C-alpha cells in the first residue's frame, strides 16, 4: 500500500534493501512503475528497488536492466547541468602551447560524502589537500595547434599510445573504461567539438576544425599509476578541461571546471563525486561543502597548513605507494547501490563521515596535531566500514 501510494507515503525514504527482501521473500508483486512526471530521484530509487527485488528473486537479466536504468536516470539529472552548448574558438597563436599541470589529492575526512546520490540528497563535507610528488605536479596536459591536418591527435607519454581522431563518431567513443583516451575525448566533446555540445552545426569534425582554424595535438602525462587512490583520473580530467578552456577561450572558472569534471565522469559511466577534482585544482588544504540538489558546487573554506609544512610536523607525514591499484568504477557501483537503497547502515555511516569532516576542520584550525592524527585514524576505520576492500591483507601487512 505504501508503494502504491508513493506520492503520499514515505515508502521511497525507507530502507529499500529491507523492503526488497520483504517483497521477494513474500512473493509480493512489484508496484506499478512511477510515471515520468515523478521526481527524478524518486524514479532512481524506484528503479534500484526493483533491481534489488528482482535480483533476490533470481531474475538476473531483469535486475541488471533496472540497475542500468537507475544509474542512467541519475546520469541524466547530472548531465542536465552541463547541456550549455559551447562555441570554441582558437585563443592561442600558431606557435603557442597550452600547458596544464595539477597536483593530486589526499582526503583526510568526509570522503564518500561527495558521491551521488548521497550528496544530491544531503550534501557533502570533505577535507582534502593538494600534493605534488618530488616537488612537481604529476598530472600534465599539453595542447597545441596542428596547422597541417584538420583532425585531433591524442598522445599519452606514460602509456606510449597515440590515436588520430578524424570523425565525430570516433570522438564520441569515450565511454570505454580503460581506453587511454577516454578522458580527452569526453573533454573535447564537452568543450564543443561534438554536435551534442556545440552551438553551431557542422557537417563533419573536419569542417568544424577548418572553421576553428586548425587541428589539435593533445599530449597527456600521468606520473602516477591509475587506481592509486589519489584521485588521478578525475584530476587529469579537470586538468584536460582546464587546458581546453584556455586553448578555446571558453571562459570557465575553476568551479565550472570542477562541475564539468563531474559531468565528464558521468559521460564515461565511471561515476564518482566532486572531491577529487576540487582537491587537485584548488591548492592547499580545505574543507569543501555542498548542499543537497543536482547542482553540486562546493563552498571552499581554506585551512592553515602549519600541521603539514612546519619543520616539527613535516616528518610525521609519509605517502607510501603499496603497488596495489583498484579502478574506481566497481568500487563506486556497489557503494552507490547502498545509497540508492537507503541502506540504514550506509546512510548512518555517511552522516557520521560528514560530521567527522567538521571535527577534523576544528582540529586543524586549533593547530592540534595529536587530535588531527587521532581523527585520521577514525577516517581509516570509517572507510573500511564502508568499503571492505580499503584494507586488503597486503596493505595490513605494510601497516603491521
Language-model segments: residues:
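C-terminal nucleotide
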Residues: 1-210, 221, 259-271, 277-400
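Helix-loop-helix module between adjacent transmembrane segments
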Residues: 187, 226-228
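Flexible, acidic active-site loops/lids enriched in D/E/S/T/G that coordinate Mg2+ and/or position polar
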Residues: 214-220
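DPxDG-like acidic metal-binding loop motif
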Residues: 228-250
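Conserved acidic
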Residues: 232, 253, 345, 349
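Inter-helical turn/loop segments and adjacent helix faces that build the functional surface
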Residues: 247-254, 297
Amino acid at each position: 500500500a505504501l508503494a502504491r501510494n508513493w506520492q503520499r507515503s514515505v515508502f521511497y525514504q525507507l530502507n529499500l534493501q529491507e523492503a526488497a527482501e520483504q517483497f521477494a521473500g513474500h512473493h509480493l508483486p512489484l508496484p506499478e512503475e512511477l510515471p515520468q512526471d515523478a521526481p527524478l530521484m524518486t524514479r532512481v530509487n524506484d528503479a534500484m528497488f526493483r533491481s534489488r527485488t528482482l535480483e533476490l528473486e533470481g531474475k538476473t537479466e531483469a535486475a541488471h536492466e533496472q540497475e542500468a536504468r537507475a544509474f542512467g536516470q541519475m546520469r541524466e539529472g547530472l548531465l542536465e547541468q552541463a547541456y550549455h552548448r559551447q562555441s570554441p574558438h582558437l585563443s592561442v597563436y600558431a606557435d603557442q602551447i597550452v600547458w596544464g599541470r595539477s597536483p593530486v589529492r589526499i582526503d583526510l575526512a568526509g570522503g564518500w560524502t561527495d558521491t551521488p546520490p548521497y550528496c544530491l540528497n544531503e550534501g557533502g563535507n570533505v577535507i582534502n589537500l593538494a600534493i605534488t610528488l618530488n616537488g612537481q605536479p604529476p598530472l600534465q596536459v599539453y595542447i597545441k595547434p596542428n596547422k597541417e591536418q584538420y583532425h585531433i591527435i591524442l598522445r599519452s607519454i606514460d602509456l606510449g599510445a597515440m590515436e588520430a581522431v578524424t570523425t565525430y563518431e570516433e570522438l564520441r567513443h569515450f565511454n570505454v573504461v580503460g581506453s587511454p583516451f577516454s578522458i580527452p575525448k569526453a573533454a573535447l566533446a564537452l568543450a564543443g567539438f561534438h554536435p551534442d555540445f556545440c552551438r553551431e552545426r557542422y557537417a563533419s569534425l573536419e569542417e568544424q576544425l577548418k572553421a576553428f582554424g586548425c587541428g589539435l595535438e593533445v599530449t597527456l602525462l600521468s606520473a602516477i599509476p591509475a587506481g592509486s587512490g589519489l584521485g588521478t583520473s578525475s584530476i587529469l580530467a579537470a586538468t584536460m578541461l582546464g587546458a581546453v578552456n584556455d586553448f578555446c577561450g571558453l571562459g570557465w572558472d575553476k568551479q565550472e571546471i570542477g562541475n564539468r569534471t563531474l559531468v565528464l565522469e558521468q559521460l564515461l559511466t565511471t561515476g564518482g563525486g566532486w572531491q577529487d577534482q576540487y582537491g587537485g585544482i584548488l591548492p592547499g588544504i580545505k574543507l569543501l561543502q555542498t548542499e543537497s540538489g543536482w547542482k553540486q558546487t562546493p563552498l571552499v573554506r581554506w585551512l592553515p597548513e602549519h600541521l603539514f609544512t612546519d619543520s616539527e610536523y613535516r616528518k610525521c607525514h609519509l605517502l607510501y605507494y603499496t603497488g596495489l591499484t583498484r579502478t574506481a568504477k566497481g568500487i563506486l557501483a556497489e557503494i552507490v547501490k547502498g545509497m540508492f537503497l537507503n541502506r540504514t547502515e550506509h546512510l548512518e555511516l555517511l552522516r557520521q563521515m560528514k560530521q567527522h569532516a567538521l571535527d577534523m576542520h576544528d582540529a586543524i584550525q586549533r593547530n592540534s596535531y595529536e587530535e588531527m592524527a587521532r581523527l585520521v585514524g577514525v577516517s581509516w576505520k570509517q572507510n573500511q566500514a564502508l568499503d571492505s576492500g580499503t584494507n586488503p591483507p597486503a596493505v595490513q601487512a605494510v601497516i603491521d
